[in-house]
């Protein structure tokens, strides 16, 4: 789970202001942070099935947002992929 301060930093970095939480880039960045945290958790707790299920849901949700973004604006898609270091 992301702390409030880290969440605010991500929102400000990708959304421009702390109030701009609905932007696709912000949502993708927050999901990426959650996914990274869950991945680290699962490396230690291999049999934690509920967390694994939640991880897969979050990956799918991020994929849908990335698909939406590539349809709307390819340049924004390329920027977010480069910033977060995601594969295509």
Curated annotation (Swiss-Prot):
Q: Name one GO biological process term.
A: translation
Classify the source by domain of life: Bacteria
Pfam families, alphabetized: Ribosomal_S15
Could you state one GO cellular component term attached to this entry? cytosolic small ribosomal subunit
SUPFAM superfamilies linked: S15/NS1 RNA-binding domain
Q: Does the keyword Ribonucleoprotein apply?
A: yes
Q: Mind telling me which InterPro entries this protein's record contains?
A: Ribosomal_uS15, Ribosomal_uS15_bac-type, uS15_NS1_RNA-bd_sf
What Gene Ontology terms describe what this protein does at the molecular function level?
rRNA binding; structural constituent of ribosome
All disulfide bonds of the chain are: none
Supply the alphabetized keyword list: Ribonucleoprotein, Ribosomal protein, RNA-binding, rRNA-binding
Identify the HAMAP family for this entry: Ribosomal_uS15_B (MF_01343_B)
- NCBIfam families membership: S15_bact
Q: How does it assemble?
A: Part of the 30S ribosomal subunit. Forms a bridge to the 50S subunit in the 70S ribosome, contacting the 23S rRNA.
- Function as written in the Swiss-Prot or TrEMBL entry: One of the primary rRNA binding proteins, it binds directly to 16S rRNA where it helps nucleate assembly of the platform of the 30S subunit by binding and bridging several RNA helices of the 16S rRNA. Forms an intersubunit bridge (bridge B4) with the 23S rRNA of the 50S subunit in the ribosome.
Q: Which family does it belong to?
A: Belongs to the universal ribosomal protein uS15 family.
Protein's name according to its UniProt entry? Small ribosomal subunit protein uS15
Designated gene of the protein = rpsO
């Amino acid at each position: 789970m992301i702390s409030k301060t880290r969440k605010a930093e991500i929102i400000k970095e990708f959304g421009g202001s702390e109030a701009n939480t609905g932007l696709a880039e912000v949502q993708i960045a927050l999901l990426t942070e959650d996914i990274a945290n869950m991945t680290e958790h699962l490396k230690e707790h291999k049999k934690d099935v509920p967390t694994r299920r939640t991880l897969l849901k979050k990956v799918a949700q991020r994929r849908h947002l990335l698909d939406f973004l590539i349809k709307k604006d390819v340049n924004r898609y390329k920027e977010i992929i480069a910033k977060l270091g995601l594969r295509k």
